[in-house]
Curated annotation (Swiss-Prot):
Residues 719-731 have a biased composition (Polar residues). Residues 146-186, 231-255, 306-344, 430-455, 520-560, 654-706, 719-755, 881-958, 1329-1369 are annotated as: Disordered. Residues 146-180 have a biased composition (Basic and acidic residues). It comes from Dictyostelium discoideum (Social amoeba). InterPro entries: Erythrocyte_Invasion_ImmMod. It comes from the Eukaryota. Residues 732-749 have a biased composition (Pro residues). Residues 232-241, 306-327, 430-449, 523-559, 654-693, 1329-1347, 1354-1369 have a biased composition (Low complexity). This is Putative uncharacterized protein DDB_G0280555.
Amino acid sequence: MLVTYNGHVDDNSINNQIIENNVQTDDLNNSFDNHKDQIELKSYKETENIETENIETENKEVETINNEIIKISQEIEISKSQEIDKTNNNINEQNNDNFEIPEKELQEIEACPCNKNIIINDSNNYNVTIIQNDDSIVIENCTDCGDHITPKEEEEKEKEKEKEKEKEKEKEKEKEKDSEESLQEQCLNKENESIDNDNNNNIINNNNNDSIIIIKESTDDKKEIPSIECIQNNQNNQNNNDSPINKEIEDDNNNNIEKDGADIHIKEEQVEKVQVEEKEVEEIQVKDNANSVTSTIVTATDVTTTTTTTTTTTSSSNNCTNSISNTDKSTTTNCPPVENGGDSDGKLMYPLYKKVFGNKTISKLIFKNIRKIQRFKSITIESPSSPLPLSDIHGYGQVKSYSNITFEYMVFNWMIDLLHDKIVKNNEDLNFNNNNNNNNNNNNNNNNNSQPYHYQLKGSQSHEILLKNLKPNDENSKQLLKSFFKKYCDRNSILKKLTEYNNPLLTKLVLKDYLNDFKPVKNNNNNNNNNNNNNNNNNNNNNNNNNNNNNNNNNINNNSYFYKSVPNELLFNLILQQGEIKLVKQVLNGKYKELKLNQMSIHYALKSTLKNEIIQYIINNNRKELSQLYLKSNKCIVGSRRLFLSIFVPPPTTTTTTTNTNSTNTNSTINATSPPHTPKLSSSPLLTTTTTPPASPTQSRIPLVRTLTQLPSRIPLVRTQTQLQTKIQPKSPQPQPTAAPEPQKPPTPSIVKNQMHSQINITPQTKDYIEIGEMIGFEFRIFLELFEVTFPNVPKFRITESCVDSLKELVLKRSIENQNNKSIYSFDVLFDIFRITLHLVLIGCLKLIGDHENNNYNNNNNYNNNINNINYNNNINNNSYNNINNNNYNNNNKTTTTTTTTTTTTTANSNKSKTNKNKNNNNNNNNNNNNNNNNNNNNNNNNNNNNNNNNNEKNIINNDNNINNNEIDISKDKKDLVKFRAIFNQINNLRQTYLFKKKNQEFEIEIKKLFFLDFIPLFGFNEKLLFEKSCLKIDLLHEEKKYGWIIGQEEQPNTLFIKEQLIKSSYEKLDANLFGLSVFLFGIERFSSGSQWFSYPNKIVNNKITNGPYNGNLDKQIQFLEGMIENCKTYKLFDRNETIGIIEAILNSIVITIQNNNDNNNNNNNNNNNNNNNNNNNNNNNNNYNIISIFEKKIQKLLGNCPIKVGAHSLFHSLELIEFCFNNCRDLINFSCCDSMNTLYRDSKFLSIIEFYHRNNLFFGNCSMEIGKSRKRSIAEKIYSFGYRFSNNLIPLAVYNDRESGYLFYYAVEKFIIEKLFNGDGSDYDESNCSSSSSSSESNGIDSGSESGRGRCRSNTTNNSNNINNSSNNNQRFQLHFLLSGNSIPRVIKRNEIFLPTNSKLKWFNLLLSSCGELFTYFPSNEGLCSDFDTPKTNFNLNYEEFYILKFITPFLYKKFKNSFSIKKDFYH
């Protein structure tokens, strides 16, 4: 945590004094001697040095001071609280006794609270568990206690302190007179000044939700000591005089409160200036002076830094509690972890508590518990991704600060903390369960229900009384608490606090009662028993707490003290956090009638850990309105369509057929904690591990080889190792038995046609859906997953075995990884799928069924049985059915089944689910195992059926030639695209019609009609032929048996046939649509950024990269590339860059093929493939694919004919290929273009390739690193380290043109320019001296960081001085290549030039650079070299980045031209 000492004017002088005391008592004494007139803080540098050099001694000293402070504060408190007690007539002695802490115990606690309750954070779930240790147990690494201080030492130090305080008092009285005049001025200036200071120096953005404590150091003592009036005025201005707590305090505590009220805001810091009843307050303040510390907390939540001039109850150490912000009325409870001693247990705040609460016993109680509270807070809230951060949930961006939170909220925070502590402490009192007795405890809880454990209170409604009389089991508390909240608390704040706190116990206490306000009170005790055991709330830290969380749901029923004005989404968020699907369902059911669900509520729900259960609920119960709410809410979110895809799923039970769909759908116990925004890495949310894998019928059936996580940013659709060695032989008979015991056959085409046109109305809803280009480019993964869902009962509807392969690969990818996480899709998703399915189905499945070899399938038969029996049965049945049974989803019976397999499984499983509803998981598993046997038998039946159908398929295959003859006229494209849209609209219309109507079969049939009758003919296919042979008859299970592979083995069937065909047809016909699809088929995905369509990630299997079309068949790859390039001028769906991307993607796959074959590993992966294929591989390996001849003859020719200079991205993963191209087709490859540097950066070959670039004076021209922003700085540092290594050549820099990445750029550049170039002329820099440091910095990720990293290996250091001239010969160039954006023509840069592209933003900079001829050359990207600019014009209008570059990166330029530019007005914004 970063602590900066700066001085807010209204952070009163006490801060400084306390800090001083904490840092070094001796220094404080010295400062008194040296400066008699005023107390002066050490400068920031001094304190920093002291901290860094003397941390250990400092900690000890701080501890001694703290202990002593406690003692003093106790005395003060006793004397003060006696007075206050007189005025507080409402306090019952009885209640006080409950909270009375014996003095001895209190001292022990103060001495070392370590042995009390310790709070442990689970880094995964960010839930907090409290372990109750015996007092005898001492926790290791107690950072809080420091060295315990002997009483003698304490007494001595006390005396010293008191003397010091007397001195201070005298000095301050003198100061008072001098400074009174300036006070008013200070009041006015205070706010501005503090903000300015913050902006200039002290705001540190911290992305981890840490709080940054900024204690401002003020140089002018007069400013340090504003009077109370000044402060109060300020507060009034800031708070608009309407802080209810102030009035309340005055009312409740009469005269004393007036003092206390002032103190509350002042927090006892204006010791010298207390003008309210100066005598008494002053005494106390002088004593307390060293005991309370105030600081300004700047909370850096994620992106935004909220600078609040806040008075906080905070110690001066690395600790923070709640800060009450005067300026924006916001409170932060973010506390960094306690470190290095300090006031971690709140000792310094003790006097403040006493002031606030006016009673020593309550103060002691808070004081006693403060350490646990603080630690709890620091742990809970620190975690950057606590379960449902408000910011993400809202989708509005970051929540900067909570609004309308004032002092009463602080009180509430304390109360919650207190309650939290009491709850933890009095576990047994509160009917919490003990470790292991889940079931028994459930019963007990139900019995005890009559004694709900709330924060029960009696007495007056003042917050003091409320807090003083808190008793967990006091039955009279309801009204008090309710009125308290009504009077003092912003309901939103309470819920936000609870959300932030993420304390399940507290939340449930509050929530349950709150919910009861929404409904007639009923006891629902017995409902949750079964679920409790299953849904352990993700709090796996400690059994006690887990069980408690689960079982507590039953206990709280009748009391409610919140009222109903809380925002629904907040409340719902809290409910979701509890992880109890039952409670959520009750809310969804409308049990709490006034708790209206709005869009954001549903949005939360569908991002929570309960997402899958909620979706199931929505679908099973046909809750159309909820899904609509979600769709609406998603408009707040970027990429809502994709997000929607990742979330919504189709009715499980209705899914027309397979049990599998049902089983997959209805899994209820899914712990998918998915980050609300799926990372770009997997561009489709569906694929990210976060979203629970969509379960599709096949998914369950087909074991998948690759897990999701392995998926690169786009899905190389290609089977990992698939070699598609199958030759395309259109006429070769196809051994795919069209076996389909097919209960429901699609109507014959002719009938369909008539119905089709009569029934379908075209309703344009295109605007909601992505345009055709993106349709084609729509993520293939989603297509695959949804494809299954689209035709749930038609596993037979497959695109070919190749389709099946893809489906398996994609859909199952996930099931392996998340065995239990099956999910389902809604028709909305289906619609998106259709866009692709269409394309795919059409083209792939249909046209191309016939062309492939018999051999492909024969060898794979061995594995099918294993797959079906093991994976299909166990995974699907056990996982999904168990969940179904537990959660009482018994809709399975409704499904109709297509194949015998599915039917039997369905019926068997559904029956089981009825009987086993309430049984434990174990029983369910056994039942399902029995079902597995049934499935095996069924599979055998299917095999027989399939064999019978072989003949039919052969006939169909012969017809393929007809299809091939249907050429597509590219000129028709536009016209066809219009039709295309119309068809999609029809589909959408259908979707609307059937959405949630559980008419899947009808829907499916209609869709098929669309597919085959309207859509496919657009591509010139023979619709009748298609319809008849549309793969509908081929049963998926059968295909799996025939062509499946063993799960977990890398061996897979040959590459997707469909790909081959699509690619083939796309370059035969040069059809843009087909091509677009084929591109996606082999895994290139469109980026959302638009300008960069494709990424080139790798799938690494067995240390081998696989990617691209025709994996392993270089000839076909090149053939396809040929077809692509021949037509590269004519693509209508892709712009120039996209065409480049396509070609590069193909190149990439070629590279990978070459690389894989060179590694000779393909054979191993294809153990079970045909011998023919293996032989092919061997031949290829021997020839090494004749890389040179291939490139010379084909690629060189092709690229030469293409008007586009292909970038080197796709070459990056093969150093051989880079070298080859560099030597042989350098004129065709743009080596300055390295968009995939992101992949490169993570690639093990990063160094070798960069070295190659450096050796050859190549440079990374237009690099855009696709890296998360959080990594940018580390990458900059990494690049910096490479810069050391390669300083004689080139420093690769990857830059975006946005502000944040700009910093990355400036960071790296700053180091180089300032430290290397401008410490000399660049010739005196010798890399040799830095080699060791560079290597160490690499391994540690540049451990030195930005502050210290700068000093390493400067050319002017003594280490380098001996070698200054070693590297100055002409051959070694020190090239610094900067690109902010824009394309540039590569060239070798003369020594010490800085290379910048032409860029509108940077024109001014280019002008400036051009005038420094000796160092810079202006080189616009497309115009050639020209540096003949006139002298710079005056008045360049700079933006922030430009100013930053000019001032900090090129300070010499700044000095030279600083009068020539002005900064834009919004510079600081």
